[in-house]
């Protein structure tokens, strides 16, 4: 497997046709390239230490289901294009037998198993908008065993009747932001890339309503813990399809003079 130096070379190597589920079928050469990529991904992941677990071997865990289709791939039924930069980095990590940095930002307290299914001869016909973990047999990625803070129910913003929707401009690029709250709850919200980090903070405050938390800051764990400048736009802060973590700010009484 040749080494990938940049995104352009990744696009050349991943010759699978990408796009929405109703895109045109692949020609013979494109299909062969797609099959080669999917097969090599399994091979490289195996060399890096990925293994298939039987149901009796598995422990309590959070699993992620990845399906590789003709026209793209899905992560727990969330459709993604092969040509997208974030998707390329995600799959390149899988190919190396590593847990993608995106998942490190989501799961930091629980073991994660990844199931990769080969569906390169099929076209993905339906998608779901929200990434959610699943339970099932999977390929464990070597040493990647992050933990999740608490078992939290996935909640979409549409389920909050008191939540004010974020105003979107459909003429501008839109991205989904996964938000992990300090209480363990998680939600997904769409923003324009021109929105600022402060808009995410405003959204969280409205989302929490009367149960508003103490003062907090926003951070991302990709590729390392980084606190965010609230004045930056999502595009400037490189937060497209990112995971944002609510970090409570500790408050303490001033030292008393003796």
UniProtKB/Swiss-Prot annotation:
Family annotation (InterPro entries): NSFL1C_SEP_dom_sf, SEP_domain, Ubiquitin-like_domsf, UBX_dom
Pfam families according to UniProt: SEP, UBX
Compartment annotation: Golgi apparatus; Endoplasmic reticulum; Perikaryon; Cell projection, Dendrite
UniProtKB keywords: Cell projection, Cytoplasm, Endoplasmic reticulum, Golgi apparatus, Nucleus, Ubl conjugation
GO biological process: cellular response to leukemia inhibitory factor; negative regulation of ERAD pathway; negative regulation of proteolysis; positive regulation of protein catabolic process; regulation of gene expression; regulation of protein catabolic process; regulation of protein ubiquitination
Post-translational modification note: Ubiquitinated.
Amino acid composition bias (Basic and acidic residues), ranges on this chain: 1-14
Official protein name in the record: UBX domain-containing protein 2A
């Amino acid at each position: 497997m040749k080494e990938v130096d940049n995104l352009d070379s990744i696009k050349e190597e991943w010759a699978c046709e990408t796009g929405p589920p109703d895109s045109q079928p692949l020609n013979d050469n494109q299909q062969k390239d797609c099959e080669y990529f999917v097969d090599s991904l399994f091979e490289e992941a195996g060399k890096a230490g990925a293994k298939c677990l039987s149901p009796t071997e598995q422990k309590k865990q959070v699993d992620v289901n990845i399906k590789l289709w003709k026209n793209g791939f899905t992560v727990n039924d969330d459709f993604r294009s092969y040509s997208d930069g974030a998707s390329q980095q995600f799959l390149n990590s899988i190919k190396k037998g590593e847990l993608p940095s995106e998942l490190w930002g989501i799961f930091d307290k629980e073991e994660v198993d990844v199931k990769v299914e080969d569906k390169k001869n099929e076209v993905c016909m339906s998608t779901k908008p929200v990434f959610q973990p699943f339970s099932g047999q999977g390929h464990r990625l070597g040493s990647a065993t992050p933990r999740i803070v608490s078992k939290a129910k996935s909640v979409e913003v549409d389920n909050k009747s008191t939540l004010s929707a974020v105003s979107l401009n459909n003429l501008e690029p839109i991205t989904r932001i996964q938000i992990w709250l300090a209480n363990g709850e998680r939600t997904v919200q769409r923003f324009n890339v021109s929105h600022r980090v402060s808009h995410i903070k405003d959204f969280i405050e409205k989302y929490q309503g009367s149960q508003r938390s103490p003062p907090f800051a926003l951070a991302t764990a990709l590729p390392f813990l980084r606190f965010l400048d609230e004045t930056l736009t999502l595009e400037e802060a490189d937060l497209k399809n990112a995971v944002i973590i609510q970090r409570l700010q500790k408050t303490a009484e001033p030292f008393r003079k003796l």
